[in-house]
A protein has these predicted regions:
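Nucleotide/phosphate-binding catalytic cleft detector across ATP-hydrolyzing
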Residues: 1-17, 21-208, 225-226, 236, ...
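Short, glycine/acidic-enriched loop or turn micro-motifs at the edges of active sites
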Residues: 15, 213-214, 220
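Glycine-rich beta-strand-to-loop/alpha-helix junction loops that act as flexible
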Residues: 79-84, 212, 323-333
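Short glycine/threonine-rich loop-to-helix capping motif typified by GTGT followed
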Residues: 198-200, 330-344
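Conserved structured catalytic cores and adjacent interaction surfaces
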Residues: 207, 219, 224-227, 231, ...
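A general structural motif
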Residues: 300-309
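Hydrophobic, well-ordered secondary-structure elements that form the walls
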Residues: 308, 327, 375
Length: 406
């Protein structure tokens, strides 16, 4: 039996699956994955809850499976969130230093970050993250920790991630209905980036693209910090829908064809090859052209990368990603997907590998579990920052900035 005070759980309620990852944090802060639970997701559409009772059952099944594998009782989770309502932008906060000796204190840092978060969001939205980028002291830029410096004007740049309050609360309430506490909600794209990227990759500049069932989340790092985030309401399920429509087959058969014969690029060896589908559900025998199948997939996946590239170009970030692009999520399993993405994004593209996490290879080696692992990793950083801190405000002051620079 494990020491449950060191147990951290990441819970992803996705469009295609619900996944719970149990991690044990060692004394040196390292995270070891000791449990994994998953169930098919039946009540989520484009990353958002559409049938709460059904989702509740799926979450319960995933939690129970994770508990049994890890031999622990799960009480708290870090909950991943996504959806087209999630938005991100950069903002600057300003705070005058009024102490007699002009020395910048922790309170000054807390106040300037608070000012950066005081933005005019739509009434129905709430801040999910305010991620510190860089501080400025009397105009001096590139300051990572201003505490103890002398100055009269403190500024901070932050990346703000926000979402629709009710949609976020729907997920939180559902989890709490299962007698679980939500330690914190975390943007799925952020979680995935924490699982994959090293500190050096963040400094060089990197793009993480998480292709899920109903959404594609992405995060851009440059100079060690997050500069941009985005969510597309397009994912792997849309590929299956396209196949069902284009090939005139049931959705379940389209999904199977995608997994067994799919490719992001048309395989030259498949040209002219056909598949004869067996009789199913009383439907007549059907012949499928494999080249046509792969071309349908290629067009949809191409669209996803084009939309990401257009957003990066508009944000002026395309030239700052020297470490390249890292793919994860179930959609990253499609053969040839990196080869498809490279000419569109005009940089190197590879399948992401979990970084600085040990444990179950069945979880660590699969791109579809990256987000849930990242949620647990987010929690492990939070735990490390709590150690030795005397009060809640003190515990949370620098957590996000520290996490994102690791």
């Amino acid at each position: 039996m494990f020491d449950e005070s060191n147990i951290i759980v990441g819970l992803e309620i996705g469009t295609s699956k619900v996944c719970a990852v149990v991690g044990e944090q060692s004394a040196d802060g390292a995270l070891n994955v000791i449990g994994l639970g998953q169930s098919r997701s039946r009540g989520v559409r484009k990353g958002e809850i559409a049938d709460a009772p059904m989702v509740e059952e799926d979450v319960r099944n995933a939690i129970v499976e994770a508990e049994q594998m890890a031999d622990v009782e799960i009480r708290n989770v870090y909950l991943g969130v996504t959806g087209a309502h999630i938005r991100g932008f950069n903002n600057r906060g300003v705070h005058p230093v009024v102490s007699a000796d002009r020395e910048i204190s922790d309170d000054d840092v807390q106040d300037v970050v608070k000012n950066a978060k005081a933005i005019n969001l739509p009434n129905e939205n709430t801040v999910v993250h305010a991620i510190r980028q860089h501080f400025f002291v009397d105009g001096q830029d590139g300051v990572t920790n201003p505490v103890g410096m002398l100055g009269s004007r403190l500024e901070v740049d932050v990346h703000v991630v926000h979402g629709h309050t009710n949609r976020l609360q729907n997920a939180i309430r559902l989890v709490k209905g299962l007698q679980l506490e939500v330690d914190e909600i975390v943007f799925n794209g952020l979680a995935s980036s924490l699982a994959l990227l090293s500190g050096e990759q963040k400094e060089l500049g990197a793009l993480v693209i998480d292709i899920g069932g109903g959404t594609t989340d992405y995060v851009v790092y440059s100079d060690g910090v997050i500069k941009h985030t985005g969510v597309l309401a397009v994912g792997g399920d849309h590929v299956s829908n396209d196949l069902a429509y284009g090939l005139k087959v049931p959705l379940s058969r389209a999904e199977k064809l995608k997994l067994e014969h799919g490719s992001a690029l048309v395989d030259e060896a498949m040209k002219g090859r056909t598949l004869t589908l067996t009789n199913e559900l009383g439907l007549p025998l059907k012949t499928i052209n494999v080249e046509h199948l792969q071309r349908i997939m290629s067009l949809r996946l191409e669209e996803i990368f084009q939309l990401v590239e257009q957003d990066l170009a508009q944000a002026g970030l395309s030239d700052y990603l020297r470490a390249g692009v890292f793919l994860c999520g179930g959609g990253a399993r499609v053969p040839q997907i990196a080869k498809l993405a490279e000419p569109i994004l005009q940089m190197s593209v590879s399948l992401g590998q979990t970084n600085s996490v040990s444990g179950l290879k069945s979880a660590l080696d699969q791109p579809e579990f990256v987000t849930a692992i990242g949620l647990a990793r987010f929690g492990s950083f939070k735990n490390r920052k709590r150690e030795g801190k005397s009060s809640f405000p003190e515990r949370i002051k620098k957590t996000i900035g520290t996490i994102l620079r690791r």
